[in-house]
Amino acid sequence: MTHPGSEIKLILLDFDGTLADTRRANTLAYVATLREAGYTLTEEEYAARYFGMRCDEFLTRIGIADPAERERLRLRTSALYPTFFDTVRLNRPLWDFCRQFRAQGGRVWIVSTGSRANIDNAMRHLGIAGPQAVRRLETPDEDTSRKGERLPEENAVDGILSGADVACSKPAPDCFLEAMRREGCTPRETLIFEDSEIGLEAARRSGASYFRVKL
């Protein structure tokens, strides 16, 4: 999907599976958390059916109806996630492309269904975020005062929108449209990079141009 003659001013990046290969780390964290709680989930099942979903939706789909239990499991998963960072890899070609784009005056945002704490911690591990873009590695819970913030110039991206920042997650296009609104850009001026089917559907519905990433 392209918009001939338009100038791209804004790049929106999904994080998990697009900017960083976090599939195995996410999978292992969920499997370990659920095993502790007495639930059975294989790595293969999570990777094939649930990767890319917002945590609360995923836990609901596997039959965990109690909101308090879902929140407890979410926090435990976030706490375990950094222990699997040895499996996380940066998509270096895409990252270098975005750095060049920013150097020429473009804007780059991360737009993800993941939690802000998980994104910050993974970026810190990969060495691609300035000091004001990340929190302490040991802090797994959401800091609502930083929801959808624009970041200072010394940071590696211009803004981050995480799963908690919009009411409707992907495949709804709300997260992408909100990032465009905050930057004052139209869909014709925006390019999206995504990997998952739900992310690609959100990109299509946003009206922007998009690329599918395969890691």
Q: Residue spans of the language-model regions?
A:
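Short beta->alpha linker loops
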Residues: 25, 50, 54, 76, ...
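Active-site neighborhood of HAD-like aspartate-dependent phosphohydrolases
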Residues: 2-48, 205
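Substrate-recognition "cap/lid" segment bordering the active-site pocket of phosphatases
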Residues: 115-191, 197-205
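Short glycine/proline-centered loop/turn elements that form peptide/ligand docking sites
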Residues: 95, 196-199, 210, 214-215
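Metal-dependent phosphoesterase signature
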Residues: 60-100, 104-106
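Conserved phosphate-coupling serine/threonine residues in phosphotransfer and NTP-handling enzymes
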Residues: 18, 112-114
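Glycine-rich phosphate-binding loop signature in dinucleotide/nucleotide-binding domains
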Residues: 4-6, 103-106, 183-189
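Alpha-helical substrate-recognition element adjacent to the catalytic core
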Residues: 28, 36-66, 80
